Amino acid sequence: MNVLVIGSGGREHALAWKLRQSPRVKQLFIAPGNAGTAQLGRNVDIKLSELDQLLNFARREAIDLTVVGPDDVLAAGIVDLFEAAGQDRKSVV
């Protein structure tokens, strides 16, 4: 499973740390991530406000699960954007 964690704080580091422990996770991406998350997966240089670029990245990397940490990204409508693009609601949490 390819997983994308969106955010750059401690919450996202904890999520990435736990996801990294799963044998089901093949690739772990964190956008934009931080120095700590770089040790767990691949940080992706996409700003949290660039929702279209996050969606394009998810498509390009065949992301199976997107975990959104920051509340403001959720409030900006990332789940609606991903759903409108054909991503299953269950795959964006």
Where are these regions (language model features)?
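ATP-binding N-terminal substructure of ATP-dependent carboxylate-amine bond-forming enzymes
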Residues: 1-93
